[in-house]
Amino acid sequence: MQREGFSENTVKAFLSDLRILTQYVGAGTAVRNISTNDLNHFVDWLANERGIPCNPKSLARRITTLKVFFGWLVESSVLLKDAAEPVVHKPVMTPLPTILSDTEFDAVLQVAQTLRRAEKPDARPYLLLTLLLHTGIKKSECMNIVLNHIDTSNPEQPFLWIRYSNPRRRHKERKLRLPVWWPETLAEYREQHQIHDTLFPCTARNLEYVLRNVADLTDLSKGLSFELLRWTCVVRDHRDGMPDDRLRQKLGISKITWREVRLKILRLTSPVL
């Protein structure tokens, strides 16, 4: 987990979950002797008999720990059979994220284009919106972009490199396609705002004000946020047929996190009955 860049808190939680399992089955029990029945009883004990409250989110995480641990033992040829695979995993679903409808999508871009072509033109709203809607990057990733992360050497296919200075986050680094017309907007923005190094040399709150202004001008009651635009990008990419693993990599998330994200995508894109 450390090699793959998981956070210190994630590693600590994983080890803590395994320690609880060890206490339950007994420190002298060989892992090959732990059965699916043992694990199901362990999950029931956590939920109902341990005497220490275990909320649904913690229980779901501990079941995930079992599946990851035993799955890894099978992949490493330590075990022949995955005892955790049949254990029922009911992920705890947080509320569905808010996204833009197709009509709202077109409306906010039209407002941003109007600002771009105004008497006192400002390309920043359009640049920011299109960047987020086409790449799905997070707020922190957006704030860390410097100009040399943007590759426009091939006019037919510009790219954005998402970089991390923290070695533990290097697994999140990725190369994302940008629209072919986006560098033109970038050039306008750079000239207007005298940008030479950091793409957005301001605070994140300042960019949130930019998004809020566009939402107000569009009469968009749900507002605009980095998270809303990220999820809008995700849902549109899924709807356009992007394969699951490619979409997961585009978002820079782990396979474990992807499980819940995918369920939310399916719920957001399923027809209303």
Where are these regions (language model features)?
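Basic, Lys/Arg- and aromatic-enriched nucleic-acid-binding interface segment
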Residues: 107-139
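A short, glycine-centered helix-capping/turn motif at helix boundaries
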Residues: 77, 131-144, 240-242, 251
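DNA breakage-rejoining catalytic core of tyrosine-based enzymes
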Residues: 79, 92-109, 169-180
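Active-site/catalytic core of tyrosine-dependent DNA strand-transfer enzymes
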Residues: 177-221
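N-terminal core-binding DNA-recognition domain of tyrosine recombinases/integrases
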Residues: 1-96, 115
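Alpha-helix N-cap/helix-start motif at helix boundaries, enriched for small hydrophobics
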Residues: 11, 66, 128-129, 136, ...
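Conserved tyrosine-mediated DNA breakage-rejoining catalytic core shared by Y-recombinases
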Residues: 144-182
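Short, basic (Lys/Arg/His-rich) helix/loop patches that form interaction surfaces
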Residues: 117, 212-249, 253-254, 267-273
